[in-house]
Amino acid sequence: MSDIRHSLLRRDALSAAKEVLYHLDIYFSSQLQSAPLPIVDKGPVELLEEFVFQVPKERSAQPKRLNSLQELQLLEIMCNYFQEQTKDSVRQIIFSSLFSPQGNKADDSRMSLLGKLVSMAVAVCRIPVLECAASWLQRTPVVYCVRLAKALVDDYCCLVPGSIQTLKQIFSASPRFCCQFITSVTALYDLSSDDLIPPMDLLEMIVTWIFEDPRLILITFLNTPIAANLPIGFLELTPLVGLIRWCVKAPLAYKRKKKPPLSNGHVSNKVTKDPGVGMDRDSHLLYSKLHLSVLQVLMTLQLHLTEKNLYGRLGLILFDHMVPLVEEINRLADELNPLNASQEIELSLDRLAQALQVAMASGALLCTRDDLRTLCSRLPHNNLLQLVISGPVQQSPHAALPPGFYPHIHTPPLGYGAVPAHPAAHPALPTHPGHTFISGVTFPFRPIR
């Protein structure tokens, strides 16, 4: 690597960046022939940091900076490299060497360039780059994933009006990237404050994607070898938890956003012109469609978990993630109570109850009814939620039924002793003489009044 470095020092920034990609392509291609998963050591990473991210090796040296035109040319070089490299394994390891966080001063430059590269790949539809980015999102800590998601949202939802259509078109080009992008976005926008409510254009795009094909949010789960214990601090296998959070919290979060300002401790009588208020009906319909799609996906999970031999072993919706959600709902309900938000609270709790019931029935949420009772005990009363946390109703033994009979529906029968289901046959009753049929006898008919 030292010989390569000395040759690169004599080149200008752009040709050095192109040359280092060429050398590392040869290096990792040879490594992959001897080992299916070669270890990326320190040498290649340092070369990339010095000649791609312009971070000098010597601490005393001043970092170089590319101007805007040079940076655009560098992005084009990288886009073309990943497009022209036909071996996915080589692409993936080069992408990982470039953009895996190292915990050093180069990480800011690394993340900035990654956001611009993926944004360019979306604009010019470079599928290999999007596929590499999907893998990167899957194996990178969530704190970096939300930074990439934020960069894309800024570029396509905030910077240029109408550019969301460009982002929307990658649905058919790279569904795997779309799935990971949705997971990142739901981690970024958790509705904990007005600033963290997803932009309307972004919400509409995601709902359109999922409503068109609900299986989109299961792509990563269905195409990834999965262990029963998932690593902590990374993105979830599916965006289900984040989407449930959106659907459940949305009625309360949007009501909080419309909260009138206080004047000397009293609610102002003036009508405030909030740009979000006019979109309430549209957002309500979008969240309703999203909630329906999420329930449809949850209903299919039992089959998929069984096929992967993970039914009862892997909870795609962790109970630990439901705890903060319920606490947030309770806090919002208390906060909005003076504003007569009874309809919004009812809708929020209805959606929570439906999601919990379907998730438990499909095996996506592994917990007991007692866990749910404890969790939801402080929430406002809701009829549907009470039915869910109570579970199937067990009928009390009836005097007319034999002791061995129990009409169970969803719960197993109680463990009674070995009692025969029916008593012994009683002696035959005396027979009565048959009645002679007399033809021609009419019976009076009187209608019931």
Curated annotation (Swiss-Prot):
Location relative to the cell: Nucleus; Chromosome
GO BP terms: brain development; eye development; mRNA splicing, via spliceosome; RNA polymerase II transcription initiation surveillance
Q: Which UniProt keywords apply?
A: Chromosome, Nucleus
Query: Could you give the subunit structure recorded for this chain?
Result: Component of the Integrator complex, composed of core subunits INTS1, INTS2, INTS3, INTS4, INTS5, INTS6, INTS7, INTS8, INTS9/RC74, INTS10, INTS11/CPSF3L, INTS12, INTS13, INTS14 and INTS15. The core complex associates with protein phosphatase 2A subunits PPP2CA and PPP2R1A, to form the Integrator-PP2A (INTAC) complex. INTS15 is part of the tail subcomplex, composed of INTS10, INTS13, INTS14 and INTS15.
One matching Pfam family, short form?
Answer: INTS15
Q: Name one GO cellular component term.
A: nucleus
Q: What does this protein do?
A: Component of the integrator complex, a multiprotein complex that terminates RNA polymerase II (Pol II) transcription in the promoter-proximal region of genes.
- Broad class of where this protein is predominantly found: nucleus
Disulfide bond entries = none
Similarity comment: family membership:
Belongs to the Integrator subunit 15 family.
Name of protein: Integrator complex subunit 15
Q: Which InterPro entries match?
A: INTS15
